[in-house]
């Protein structure tokens, strides 16, 4: 499965959002302002908000967002 960190737009200028994909499944999301805040798994864990229920609509939206290049995909930090 894919283990990735997806980087996207934040809620306001200067902020970015992230999605954590583990084994091909969306497990959490969060927001950050500075790149160093997402450089380690430990730091990500402090910012992440767990996703409990991923509906088919969310999966579809994520696929569409990928097609539109709305996310930058990085390797998930260890």
Model-inferred region functions:
Residues 1-78:
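Conserved catalytic/ligand-binding micro-motifs in nucleotide and anionic cofactor chemistry
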């Amino acid at each position: 499965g894919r283990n990735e960190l997806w980087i996207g737009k934040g809620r306001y200028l200067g902020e970015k959002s992230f999605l954590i994909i583990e084994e091909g499944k969306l497990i959490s999301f969060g927001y950050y302002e500075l790149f160093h805040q997402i450089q380690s798994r430990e730091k990500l864990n402090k910012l992440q908000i767990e996703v409990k229920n991923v509906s088919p609509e969310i999966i579809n939206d994520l696929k569409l967002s990928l097609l539109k290049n709305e996310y930058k995909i990085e390797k998930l930090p260890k």
